């Protein structure tokens, strides 16, 4: 379809569980993208993990042909986006390829913080946003109230919002009509030199690198010689097509269209996300503004349980990085765990997902150390360094000032749960910045230390608000704070992988809690195991795992007491010798226990 006026590129913005993937299923069914036999629930959530957790992680794309009421056939290019706060970078990437977005809001639950944040991103990128009220089949749906909320919180006129139910299929055609009429057609010159944006790339074992692209001008055909601007190496295009959602080879993509391209690129970094593709003979075409690089917020060490897996672990990470541009990694070695990688993630969910994908898709056994955020440290000679690993922190004597990252958290919560949410934020050392009532909800914004937010704040927030509160946060600045490194010593030996950076006021409490937790998890040995928590040279907590001991006097019947004493002394000497040479194996649960210690 070469007529640009009949193309619509759009994505769907929605909070988790507001029915985005189900709505996509209905679009595919309505436009005949798959036969009824092939329809599975949540077609676009193709990763096993996505279906299991019921969330969208990776952006997907699908091209559909829709016969509109005005008799014309439109080509709809839909780019699916995730809704969870940790995957917001995927959203900004998908939006860069669209002219419009559907804002899907649950008519029973109302607006949630994440949709608000993504909606603002869309408006900033100049997209046309069309509100849709979903789940109209629910008895508790309140469309008028929710439409008013959309207007109050986001500032979009929602009086004309389309009402539908993705589950029952009610109003799906109205949504498609609103989409065709409300979202502008793409602009682009088909005869100009090729310029295409890589939205996503992934590695296929048979095809090499597959890239999802949006062509902004020109035409991309099979057998073309293309280069990506940042790398400049020429490749010949083997396959061009669209997803319907199955791979469908078309042989050509024109300006305004979204599809996939395979060019036999075998090296993993051959087609970086956000790069511009053009023909090798028009290499001077202006590069499109890519996406801002996302900075990881949480760092953790990942180590293979068996050191033989190190190479396959490195390859697995390289393949995942291609598909997930926000994952950062560098080699790291630890005394306790051997060789592994220090990885940077966008949040705790992202970290869990990556670890699960590595274990499932690449069949690896991994140990994860406690996650930390990045701290800014001013040393005594005036240089500023960034520390993302507690064991790399300089000694107390060399530190002039430590600064922790502060983020602004925007929370939307029903007014009944406001008290509990405020209590939680205060407990996490938060400073209230703003509070306003919007309908039956309250919008609160707090400045909170990032390390308090990334650990377990999201889970705690959900539990104190019975799952109704929603959260969106972004980094603001570094701020000076009284921070110290808490070391864990086992039999007077520091275990680098268990070190933590904590606030000085919480340190003794955290140290005690950590020592007690370790006592539960470290199995009893044949000798006493002393567990200590220390700040610098000062021990703030200590506990002992008592030794297992054999009853050596069992064989003595009566007789002289000196006989028993001799046997006990002999046992004592043996235990003492054992303690000097014995090593304590620390189980994987102990490394994870660091996360579970309530701050």
Curated annotation (Swiss-Prot):
A Pfam family that the UniProt record links to this protein = LepA_C
Task: Enumerate the subcellular locations listed in this protein's record, separating them with semicolons.
Answer: Cell inner membrane
Naming one, the record's GO cellular component terms include: plasma membrane
User: What's the main place this protein lives?
Assistant: membrane
> What EC designation does it have?
3.6.5.n1
Name any Gene Ontology BP term: positive regulation of translation
**Residues annotated as binding GTP:** 17-22, 134-137
| Keyword set includes RNA-binding | no
* CDD domains associated with the record: EF4_II, EF4_III, LepA, lepA_C
Q: GO molecular function, one example?
A: GTPase activity
Q: Does the keyword Hydrolase feature in the UniProt annotation?
A: yes
The chemistry this enzyme catalyses reads: GTP + H2O = GDP + phosphate + H(+)
* Protein keywords: Cell inner membrane, Cell membrane, GTP-binding, Hydrolase, Membrane, Nucleotide-binding, Protein biosynthesis
**tr-type G domain mapped to chain residues:** 5-187
Which family is annotated? Belongs to the TRAFAC class translation factor GTPase superfamily. Classic translation factor GTPase family. LepA subfamily.
Function summary: Required for accurate and efficient protein synthesis under certain stress conditions. May act as a fidelity factor of the translation reaction, by catalyzing a one-codon backward translocation of tRNAs on improperly translocated ribosomes. Back-translocation proceeds from a post-translocation (POST) complex to a pre-translocation (PRE) complex, thus giving elongation factor G a second chance to translocate the tRNAs correctly. Binds to ribosomes in a GTP-dependent manner.
Q: What is this protein called?
A: Elongation factor 4
| Organism annotation | Teredinibacter turnerae (strain ATCC 39867 / T7901)
Organism classification = Bacteria, Pseudomonadati, Pseudomonadota, Gammaproteobacteria, Cellvibrionales
């Amino acid at each position: 379809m070469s007529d640009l006026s009949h193309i619509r590129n759009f994505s769907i913005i929605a909070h988790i569980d507001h029915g985005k993937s189900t709505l996509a299923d209905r679009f595919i069914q309505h436009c005949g993208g798959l036969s009824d036999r092939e329809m599975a629930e949540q077609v676009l959530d193709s990763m096993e993990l996505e279906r299991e957790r019921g969330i969208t992680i990776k952006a997907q794309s699908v091209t559909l042909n829709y016969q509109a009421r005005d008799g014309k056939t439109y080509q709809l290019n839909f780019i699916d986006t995730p809704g969870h706060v940790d995957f917001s970078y995927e959203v900004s990437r998908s939006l860069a390829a669209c002219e419009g977005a559907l804002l899907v809001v649950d008519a029973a639950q109302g607006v949630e913080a994440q949709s608000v944040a993504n909606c603002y991103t869309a408006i900033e990128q100049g997209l046309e946003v069309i509100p849709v009220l979903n789940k109209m089949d629910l008895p508790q749906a309140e469309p008028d109230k929710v439409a008013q909320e959309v207007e109050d919180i986001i500032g979009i006129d929602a009086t004309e919002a389309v009402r539908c139910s993705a589950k029952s299929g009610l109003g799906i055609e109205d949504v498609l009509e609103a989409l065709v009429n409300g979202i502008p057609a793409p602009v682009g010159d088909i005869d100009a030199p090729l310029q295409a944006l890589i939205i996503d790339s992934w590695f296929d074992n048979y095809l090499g690198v597959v890239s999802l692209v949006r062509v902004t001008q020109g035409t991309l055909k099979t057998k073309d010689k293309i280069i990506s601007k940042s790398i400049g190496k020429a490749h010949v295009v083997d396959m061009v097509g669209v997803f319907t959602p199955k791979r469908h080879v078309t042989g050509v993509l024109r300006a305004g269209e979204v599809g996939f391209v395979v060019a036999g690129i075998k090296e993993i970094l051959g087609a970086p996300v956000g790069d511009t593709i053009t023909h090798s003979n028009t290499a001077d075409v202006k590069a499109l503004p890519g996406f801002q690089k996302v900075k990881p917020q949480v760092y953790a060490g990942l180590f293979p349980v068996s050191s033989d897996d190190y190479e396959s672990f490195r390859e697995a990470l390289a393949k995942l990085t291609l598909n997930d541009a926000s994952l950062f990694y560098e080699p790291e070695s630890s005394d306790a765990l051997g060789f592994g990688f220090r990885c940077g993630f966008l949040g705790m969910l992202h970290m869990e997902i990556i670890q699960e994908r590595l274990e499932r898709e690449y069949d690896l056994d991994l140990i994860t150390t406690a996650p930390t955020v990045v701290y800014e440290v001013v040393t005594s000679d005036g240089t500023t360094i960034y520390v993302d690993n507690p064991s790399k922190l300089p000694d107390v004597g060399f530190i002039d000032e430590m600064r922790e990252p502060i983020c602004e958290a925007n929370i939307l919560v029903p007014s009944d749960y406001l008290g509990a949410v405020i209590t939680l934020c205060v407990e996490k050392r938060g400073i209230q910045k703003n509070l306003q009532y919007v309908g039956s909800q309250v919008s609160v914004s707090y400045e909170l230390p990032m390390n308090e937010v990334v650990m377990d704040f999201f889970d705690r927030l959900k539990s104190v608000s019975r799952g109704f509160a929603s959260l969106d946060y972004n980094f603001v600045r570094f701020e000076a704070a009284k921070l110290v490194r808490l070391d864990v010593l086992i039999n007077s030996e520091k275990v680098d992988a268990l070190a933590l950076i904590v606030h000085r006021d919480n340190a003794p409490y955290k140290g005690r809690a950590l020592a007690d937790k370790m006592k539960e998890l470290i199995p009893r040995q044949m000798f006493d195991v002393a567990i200590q928590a220390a700040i610098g040279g000062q021990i703030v907590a200590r506990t002992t795992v008592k030794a297992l001991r054999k009853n050596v006097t069992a064989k003595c019947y009566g007789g002289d007491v000196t006989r028993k004493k001799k046997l006990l002394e002999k046992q004592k000497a043996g235990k003492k010798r054992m303690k000097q040479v014995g090593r304590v194996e620390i189980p994987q649960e102990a490394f994870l226990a660091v996360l579970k210690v309530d701050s």
